[in-house]
Design a protein with these regions (language model features):
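Alpha/beta enzyme core
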Residues: 1-11, 21-48, 55-71, 79-172
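Boundary/entry segment of secreted carbohydrate-active catalytic domains
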Residues: 13-17
Length: 172
């Protein structure tokens, strides 16, 4: 996924990420990514990944991605349970967003470091700094105190070992 993102930036475009709750959605997303000749990220929510069926979905998405005509990453998105992250990687996730943003900066850093030690260097590790209230499906008004503090970014990335960073800049 790192190479996928770097190539997109160099080409002047983004790599879209779509949350896939089922295989049919993933098929449609990958088909359109192939039609556009663009890389894509298939996200799986922790709630979906937390069941045997969800882990099977991750495995199926990995196979779909391996046979796609464009680069496809499979990411466990916004996971705060280290053991779930490990199970998702074992099932085939190629990237994880280790979300320790509910804790202090130090707790978040320690959580991301723990996840890195559990999943190894081959899995792309994204972390979150700052938070938006609500969830992916329902957002609430945020305060500035919950947004990413730009003064913390460099230290957090260096100390945590995250390769990618999800920042909270507000809702549009």
């Amino acid at each position: 996924m790192n190479q996928m993102v770097a190539q997109a930036i160099a080409a002047g475009h983004a790599v879209p990420a779509f949350t896939c709750y089922d295989f049919t959605t993933a098929l449609a997303v990958v088909a359109e990514a192939e039609a556009q000749d663009r890389a894509v990220i298939l996200n799986v929510a922790p709630k979906a990944a937390g069941s045997t069926a969800g882990l099977r979905l991750i495995s199926a998405l990995r196979t779909l991605g391996e046979h796609a005509a464009v680069p496809v990453a499979i990411q466990l998105d916004h996971a705060s349970d280290a053991q779930l992250i490990v199970r998702a990687v074992q099932a085939g996730a190629t990237a994880v967003l280790a979300d320790g943003s509910a804790g202090t900066l130090e707790e978040n850093t320690a959580f991301v470091q723990q996840v890195r030690s559990l999943i190894g260097p081959e899995v792309v590790l994204e972390a979150e700094l700052g938070a938006l209230p609500g969830n992916e499906d329902k957002a609430f008004e945020q305060s500035a105190s919950q947004l990413t503090d730009s003064a913390q970014v460099a230290r957090f990335v260096q100390d945590s070992g995250a390769q990618l960073l999800a920042v909270a800049i507000g809702n549009v």
